[in-house]
Amino acid sequence: MRMHSVLMMVVATLAIANGSVSAAGGSNLRKAKATSSINSFNTVQTEAKNSRMLRNTDVATGENGHVYYYPAKKGERKPFIEVRLKKALSNSKKVNRLYEDWYKSGFSTKKVAKELNQSENRELKETYKTLAIGYTAFVKGKQSQQQLQ
């Protein structure tokens, strides 16, 4: 019985395919040939009827307000983070304030060293290592002050 069903399906499929091919062969395609080809060199550009913008905000302003752009002076490039960080860490008041904030927040020296050791940049690693060593010295100094009191 299964073989009979399979053969009937094959015959029906062939009959449908043959009927569609013969129907397509009888159609008149001369109208498609009679149309003239479009010459793209002679097309006229039309203006847009509306001035819809793709963005909701002005390009000159960002999400939080106006965006300022200060171009670098000739021959002068913006310093990388390493240079900025070393400059900021050369100020002892800022470094001590940073150590004080870490100390008040309860960060251990091991945690600070671990968090600062995640950079793959060689210059930053050296700077962060120096910073971690400085924090360790700061914590030891604080602990010795507390023991004296």
Curated annotation (Swiss-Prot):
One of its GO terms (cellular component) is host cell nucleolus. It is found in: Secreted; Host nucleus, Host nucleolus; Host nucleus; Host cytoplasm. It comes from the Eukaryota. Keywords: Host cytoplasm, Host nucleus, Secreted, Signal, Virulence. Residues 1-23 form the signal peptide. InterPro entries: RXLR. A motif (RxLR-dEER) lies at residues 52-77. The RxLR-dEER motif acts to carry the protein into the host cell cytoplasm through binding to cell surface phosphatidylinositol-3-phosphate. The keyword Mitochondrion does not apply. The lineage of its organism: Eukaryota, Sar, Stramenopiles, Oomycota, Peronosporales. Transmembrane segments: none annotated. It comes from Phytophthora infestans (strain T30-4) (Potato late blight agent). Induction: Expression is induced during host plant infection. Pfam families: RXLR. Effector that enhances P.infestans colonization of Nicotiana benthamiana leaves. This is RxLR effector protein PITG_18609. Belongs to the RxLR effector family.
